[in-house]
Curated annotation (Swiss-Prot):
Source organism per UniProt: Arabidopsis thaliana
Taxonomic classification: Eukaryota, Viridiplantae, Streptophyta, Embryophyta, Tracheophyta
Subunit structure comment from the entry: Homotetramer.
Enzyme's top EC category: lyase
One cellular-component annotation, GO: plasma membrane
Induction: By anoxia and abscisic acid (ABA).
Chain segments carrying region Thiamine pyrophosphate binding: 434-516
SUPFAM superfamilies reported in the protein's UniProt record: DHS-like NAD/FAD-binding domain, Thiamin diphosphate-binding fold (THDP-binding)
Cofactor(s) required, per the database record: a metal cation; thiamine diphosphate
Protein name per Swiss-Prot or TrEMBL: Pyruvate decarboxylase 1
Length: 607
């Protein structure tokens, strides 16, 4: 049994454009204002103002920041840009997570921190954005330009005269690094960094010396040149050969299926993937980290393919198929449920953003995923067998038993009520943990956003990501599902949500510990100190801004809280603490946890 299909994920990103947001919609780079319409006064032609203008022209209108002595002057000049809003965060980690969430909705995000103490604090969030193929611009206020090349020891360092420690850390989690410590090439370095982030759909690092941000320079007073990203093109002969080989393979199959993966977004191929589904009639499934990339109301949609923890009847159809197209998959230990997928390489067509591998046959390079799917959809033979088989075996899910009056709330009952809240005007943010599995079961209506961080899986990510996503998409009401353990990591930026008038509904799942860790390997370290979470949020609120909190233990209290949050408190940040039993978890987490535990505990190979 070969479970390693599609694991060749080490190629560089290949999209020629900014990352598209959730549900496969397209985020475009904001067009620069025509140069004839812009007059830049020399006093405004500072390095800081130039950087601010270029961020706006790239599509960033909100920057998440934490002040520090090396970036204060730079922050002044960013604030002076009328089209740029500076959002102060409580810590650098959350600023990075917020930029991550912002990029998921808007297509590009940015954060500003100070040298080393800020840079190394935000590094974890930047690594997560790198793993998720998000264009994120991390700006650091750096040392005075006169201190480079000297033997001086500065504060915020590890006590050595070498200032490159921060840069070396960022080199592994960004696709480009710019150290701006002189004015002559600052214009070129900044533009190269931002355009590289957009082109590669990965984070970049820009360090700006603290004494340069306020200085004008003639290169910054020029008419702005729009960012121009030449579109990448497929090799026509290679594309034709790949389509021919794929058609030959698929047309021999009896019951082929399609499975979408997380790289559909970075490849800008969500719409083309749906076109192929329409033309082929194949059963259509999505990997968990691609949920929301295609419309779940598609007539041939059969759910989430996640091996042993797939939605009902989905894995049976996928794994029994004699041909499967995997579009942009990432097969890691989490997505493969401890490497237990029952897939065979000889049955798989693996389509990555820039190449196609047909079963055990050839790999075709220099081919864009979207071009491949569109050409294939024009010529593929329609075959609905797999979907018809799914339709035959499908049994609608039974509704959870209604809780008796004053009976403790159950998690499956809770999500029955969450389902009713979803619409095109909502978005779901799911924290690492049991929320992954419970939110996967939600049926997303058209236009409903959905995000979670599966590849990196950093607990606490969702607080900052919720802040950033809500700031980028004020037209949507974000529903965030956060476990108590994760919430304790990053709770501070509830404050920033309130300062910015956000109207998110946060469901705090209070079950007394790190539930996902418990199911992988239990121990006393997975038990956490219980907090008065509603009291904490009330204290953060402190009478400033619009905030409403509730603590629910029973179904009737949950229904009442949801009603209040969606009616009279619809313009408030709403925080609903849901008390659940510590062992009330999804059956999918129980299965997944045991398989991941087995994968983690494999003995060393013999030497």
């Amino acid at each position: 049994m070969d479970t390693k299909i599609g694991s060749i994920d080490d190629c560089k990103p290949t999209n020629g454009d900014v990352c598209s947001p959730t549900n496969g919609t397209v985020a475009t780079i904001h067009n620069s204002v025509p140069s004839s319409a812009i007059t830049i006064n020399y006093c405004d032609a500072t390095l800081g103002r130039h950087l601010a203008r270029r961020l706006v022209q790239a599509g960033v209108t909100d920057v998440f920041s934490v002040p520090g002595d090396f970036n204060l002057t730079l922050l002044d000049h960013l604030m002076a840009e009328p089209d740029l809003n500076l959002i102060g965060c409580c810590n650098e980690l959350n600023a990075g997570y917020a930029a991550d969430g912002y990029a998921r909705s808007r297509g590009v995000g940015a954060c500003v921190v100070t040298f080393t103490v800020g840079g190394l604090s935000v590094l974890n969030a930047i690594a997560g954005a790198y793993s998720e193929n998000l264009p994120l611009i991390c700006i650091v206020g750096g040392p005075n330009s006169n201190d480079y090349g000297t033997n001086r020891i500065l504060h915020h360092t590890i006590g050595l005269p070498d200032f490159s420690q921060e840069l070396r850390c960022f080199q592994t989690v960004t696709c480009y690094q710019a150290v701006v410590n002189n004015l002559d090439d600052a214009h070129e370095q900044i533009d190269k960094a931002i355009s590289t982030a957009l082109k590669e759909s990965k984070p970049v690092y820009i360090s700006v010396s603290c004494n340069l941000a306020a200085i004008p320079h003639h290169t910054f007073s020029r008419d702005p040149v729009p960012f121009s990203l030449a579109p990448r093109l497929s090799n026509k002969m290679g594309l034709e050969a790949a389509v021919e080989a794929t058609l030959e393979f698929l047309n021999k199959a009896v019951k082929p299926v399609m499975v979408g993966g997380p790289k559909l977004r970075v490849a800008k191929a969500c719409d083309a993937f749906v076109e192929l589904a329409d033309a082929s009639g194949y059963a259509l499934a999505m990997m968990p980290s691609a949920k929301g990339f295609v419309p779940e109301h598609h007539p041939h949609f059969i759910g989430t393919y996640w091996g042993a923890v797939s939605t009902p009847f989905c894995s049976e159809i996928v794994e029994s198929a004699d041909a499967y197209i995997f579009a942009g998959p990432i097969f890691n230990d989490y997505s493969s449920v401890g490497y237990s997928l029952l897939l065979k390489k000889e049955k798989a067509i693996v389509v990555q953003p820039d190449r196609i591998t047909v079963a055990n046959g050839p790999t075709f390079g220099c081919i864009l995923m979207s071009d491949f799917f569109r050409e294939l959809s024009k010529r593929v033979k329609r075959n609905e067998t797999a979907y018809e088989n799914y339709h035959r075996i499908f049994v609608p899910e039974g509704k959870p038993l209604k809780c008796e009056s004053r009976e403790p709330l159950r998690v499956n009952t809770m999500f029955q009520h969450i389902q009713k809240m979803l619409s095109s005007e909502t978005a779901v943010i799911a924290e690492t943990g049991d929320s992954w599995f419970n939110c996967q079961k939600l049926k997303l209506p058209k236009g409903c956003g959905y995000e979670f961080q599966m590849q990196y899986g950093s607990i606490g990510w969702s607080v900052g990501a919720t802040l950033g996503y809500a700031q980028a998409s004020p037209e949507k009401r974000v529903l965030a599902f956060i476990g108590d353990g994760s919430f304790q990591v990053t709770v501070q930026d509830i404050s920033t949500m309130l300062r910015n008038g956000q109207k998110t509904i946060i469901f705090l799942i209070n079950n007394g510990g790190y539930t996902i860790e418990v199911e992988i390997h239990d121990g006393p370290y997975n038990v956490i100190k219980n907090w008065n979470y509603t009291g904490l949020v009330d204290a953060i609120h402190n009478g400033e801004g619009n905030c409403w909190t509730a603590k629910v233990r029973y179904e009737e209290e949950l229904v009442e809280a949801i009603t209040t949050a969606t009616t009279e408190k619809k313009d408030c940040l709403c925080f609903i603490e849901v008390i659940l039993h510590k062992d009330d978890t999804s059956k999918e987490l129980l299965e997944w946890g045991s398989r991941v535990s087995a994968a983690n505990s494999r003995p060393p190979n013999p030497q």
